[in-house]
Structure formats: structure tokens, C-alpha cells
A protein has these predicted regions:
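Active-site neighborhood of phospho(di)ester-bond hydrolases with catalytic His/Asp-centered motifs
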Residues: 5-8, 24-29, 73, 96-102, ...
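Core catalytic region of metal-dependent phosphoesterases/phosphodiesterases
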Residues: 11-156, 281, 285
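Short, conserved loop/helix-junction motifs that constitute active-site signature segments
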Residues: 87-93, 208-209, 251-254, 272-273
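Conserved catalytic scaffold of divalent metal-dependent phosphoesterases
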Residues: 9-11, 30-35, 100, 104-240
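Active-site-proximal segments of metal-dependent phosphoesterases and phosphodiesterases across multiple
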Residues: 44-46, 50-51, 57-79, 212-255
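Soluble or luminal CAZymes and related metallo-dependent hydrolases
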Residues: 5, 62-84, 131-132, 182-198, ...
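Conserved beta-sheet core of the metallophosphoesterase superfamily
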Residues: 97-99, 118-122, 228-296
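Beta-strand-turn-beta hairpins that frame and shape the catalytic cleft
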Residues: 1-4, 144, 153-163, 211-215, ...
């Protein structure tokens, strides 16, 4: 089986020059984010300078001239960009296995209204978001050959494809950069929420046909490997690991043959975690990898960064 892996596009249409593949895998962040991400960068900059200010993100956007209608317009534009890309990929007539990224507007809902109130609120909201059920229906409605792998397993050519998207950071409070700020009660609640996500993914794989070769699609690369180290010197997390603990646990427990992941743009490359080969195709329209995968043995015969 030849698998064409598409990296984090962020609204950039990929250039597919080869036709020699059986299926396509998208690791998420298909939608465009350039306009929206600028607003969030301004918000984070503001909060860094004014940590005690009670202004929430919506109020901040409004203060700089972006009310709810303008934000929704930007989000709709982002989704349209993502759908055009998926329509293009669908035109090749091959099955597309994908998970939502953190920019694909597919987050789960949270009961917490003000995520800026405390470190606990902030962490809990993200765990709730990572537990989203599916990719945004507006992205894939009317398109053929699309298989949403978010907590779902699909089989193609005798190979299991299962995924976990949305994650953009380490979900485990035990190894969190903010763990010292949680009370004992908060820590226990966060650990419980984290364990629920892990159990949901593990149980989604189940026992049926789990002896078949398996390809695990994760938006974020597994935590604490060479591909999840932040290399941007201006980042608050420079030199630290920001991969997904959930994905790491899945790889070590279920031992998929192949993990295809992204999110960490500077983490392009491959490495081994336990018995799993992890491949990150990188960022942008040229971020593509062609993988030669033996659908009988589960062995990876070749990894070609295009």
C-alpha cells in the first residue's frame, strides 16, 4: 500500500505531483488561519502584558474592532478554504483518512465560560476541546471518499486506520508545564478528564481486528520524542516537549505499526517510539510524504519526503 501523507496546510493548497498512491492521510490543520491567528497573537500578547486584566478573549476582540459577526465571517472563510482543499484531494478518487487539527473548528464543547480565570480553567477547557467527536461537518459535507478517523476506526486494504485529532499540547497534568499552579482537587479533576480521553481512544480501537496492521493518525506528534521539541527561540516553550501524551500512550499500549502526525511544524522527520514508526510530514503546501506500507506484515518499506 502506498500512503500519501499531507502535513499541516493552514489553508495552502498542496501540490500533488505523483499519482502513485492508494490512499491519502491528512493530519489536520487543513483550514486557513492567517487572519484569525493574527488576532489570537494580539490577544496572547495583551494577556502577557496584562495578566491581571479580567478582559476575556471575546471582549478583547471587540475592543479592537472584531465583534461576533466579524469573527464568524473569518471562521466561515477559513472553513471554505479548507473545504476547497479537501475537494481537490477528493478529486483523485482515493480514500482520504483524516483527523481535525486545532485550526479546523471542530473542538468539543466545555461548560467553563471563562478560560482565563485560572490555570485550571484554561487547562480544563483545552481537555474538553480535545474530546471533540468529529471533524466539522461543514468541511466534508458533499465530498466523497472522506473518512473521519476521530475516535473511529476504518479498514482499507486490510489495514486499520484510527485517529485522534485536535490536540495542540501535552494533555497530561502530571507532565504539564503548569502543574505547580493546580490545587490537589484541581489536579485530580484534570487527571480524571485526561484519563477519559485516553480510555476513549484505547476503547475505540477495541479488540475486533486489532491484530491487523494499524495506522494511527494523530494531529499532534506523541509527547517526549525528538519530533515534538520546540525550536522557535521566541516561543515560551523553547527547548521543551509539546507533543500529545494521549498519542504517546496509544502508541505504547496499542503498538500501531505507523503513527502519522503533525502540528509541530519544526518537527518534520521520523523516529521510533516503542514499536511504532512516527512520521511528521511538516508544514505547508510542500509538506508531503509517500509511504510504502506492507498491508500484510505492517512493515514500513519506505518513507519518501516529497
Amino acid at each position: 500500500m502506498k500512503i500519501l501523507v499531507i502535513g499541516d496546510l493552514h489553508g495552502e493548497k498542496p501540490v500533488v505531483r505523483t499519482r502513485g498512491f492508494d490512499c491519502i492521510v491528512c493530519v489536520g490543520d487543513i483550514c486557513g488561519d492567517k487572519k484569525i491567528s493574527k488576532l489570537y497573537k494580539e490577544w496572547f500578547k495583551y494577556k502577557k502584558k496584562n495578566p491581571e486584566d479580567s478582559l476575556d478573549v471575546d471582549e478583547f476582540f471587540l475592543s479592537i474592532g472584531y465583534g461576533e459577526k466579524k469573527i464568524k465571517k473569518l471562521e466561515a472563510e477559513s472553513l471554505r478554504t479548507g473545504k476547497k482543499i479537501l475537494k481537490y484531494l477528493s478529486s483523485f478518487g482515493r480514500p482520504i483518512f483524516l483527523v481535525p487539527g486545532n485550526w479546523d473548528q471542530s473542538y468539543g464543547e466545555s461548560r467553563i465560560k471563562d478560560m482565563t480565570k485560572s490555570e485550571y480553567n484554561y487547562f480544563k477547557v483545552w481537555l474538553d476541546r480535545f474530546n471533540g467527536n468529529e471533524i466539522n461537518p461543514k468541511l466534508i459535507k458533499g465530498l466523497r471518499n472522506i473518512f473521519d478517523c476521530q475516535f473511529e476506526m476504518h479498514n482499507f486494504m486490510g489495514v486499520n486506520f484510527i485517529g485522534y485529532g485536535l490536540s495542540c499540547a501535552n494533555e497530561n497534568p502530571v507532565t504539564s508545564l503548569d502543574k505547580e499552579s493546580f490545587s490537589k482537587k484541581e489536579f485530580d479533576l484534570l487527571k480524571n478528564s485526561y484519563n477519559k480521553i485516553v480510555d476513549r481512544l484505547i476503547n475505540s480501537y477495541g479488540d475486533k481486528n486489532n491484530k491487523l496492521p494499524c495506522v494511527f493518525i494523530s494531529h499532534n506528534v506523541p509527547y517526549n520524542i525528538k519530533l515534538d521539541v520546540i525550536k522557535e527561540k521566541n516561543s515560551f516553550a523553547y527547548g521543551k516537549h509539546l507533543g500529545s501524551s494521549v498519542s504517546r500512550v496509544f502508541c505504547l499500549r496499542r503498538k500501531p505499526d505507523l503513527c502519522l502526525a503533525g502540528h509541530i511544524h519544526e518537527g518534520k522527520g521520523k523516529c521510533v517510539l516503542g514499536k511504532t514508526l512516527v512520521v511528521n510530514p511538516g508544514y505547508g503546501k510542500e509538506a508531503k510524504v509517500l509511504i510504502d506500507f506492507d498491508e500484510v506484515s505492517g512493515k514500513v518499506r519506505g518513507v519518501n519526503f516529497l
